[in-house]
Structure formats: structure tokens, C-alpha cells
Amino acid sequence: MKKEFSRVLLKNQSDEILILKDRPDTWNFPGGKQELGESALECAIREMKEELAVEITELEEIFTGPLVFDSIVWQGHFYFAKQAQGKVTLNEPNKIKGVQFIMRFEEVNFSPGLAPLFDYLARSDYLKLNKTNWK
């Protein structure tokens, strides 16, 4: 069975990007593993609601590709949420140790496995040109 996950990038009103701490020494974007029979898009929507009580709509897939974590190849799907509703709330404190908004990715430590995503984002103006509208 193919290992797949979905992650979501979204911004607050100050153009900062939401990240969470789900590993002891690295930060990540909200999301998680796909469940059986679930699409990558459905996974992204479900994980945001489960983890952080935020409902997202108008998602655009901005990056997809194989990523390697601990010698395991995963198919990663990264979405940008153009619409969000709710207050960011830590729903799974046993799994997620922190949440914050950042201006630059260099501010925190991400997994080296995300390098292909960051390479893409460095070459793209996508995050500069798009915003998340909060209700």
C-alpha cells in the first residue's frame, strides 16, 4: 500500500503561515496520513478540523511528490487554503505540542524531508500572491 499524506498551508491576516509542532525537534504544517478510501483533498480538510478546529475550503494543491522521511518514501500532497473558518485550537494536545504563525520558514526547524517542497516554494511566488480569507 502506498503511503500518502496531506498538509495544509494557510495564512493569518498578517500574512504569517500556520505551523505546528508534532515532533520533538521539528515543526510541520497541519495535516496527516490519508485514511483508507480517502482522497488527498478529503484528508487535508479532515486533518485541519481534527487537529486545529479550523474548517477550510477552496483548497489549491500547490505541490505533490515523493518525499523521504526516515528512509521511507511517502507521497506528499500540499494544499493552500484560500478560505478558513474558526479559531485555531489545539484539539490533540497529546499529538501536537505547539502551534504558531511564522513569517519566514527559516525561523524554525523543519524536517529535511520537506526540502523538495521548500525548493519549489523558493522558486515560486505562490505564497506572496495568495491569501487566506478568514470568516
List where the protein language model places each region.
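Active-site segment of metal-dependent pyrophosphate-handling enzymes
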Residues: 4, 53-87
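Conserved N-terminal beta-strand and adjoining loop/helix that marks the start
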Residues: 1-17
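Short helix-loop capping/hinge motifs at secondary-structure junctions, enriched
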Residues: 16-17, 85-89
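Acidic/histidine-enriched, glycine/proline-rich intrinsically disordered or flexible terminal extensions
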Residues: 125-135
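Conserved Nudix-box catalytic region and its N-terminal flanking loop in Nudix hydrolases
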Residues: 12-50
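Conserved hydrophobic "DFG−1" position in protein kinase catalytic cores
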Residues: 10-11, 19, 81, 101
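NUDIX/MutT-family hydrolases
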Residues: 80, 90-123
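A generic fold-level signal
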Residues: 3, 12, 71-74, 94, ...
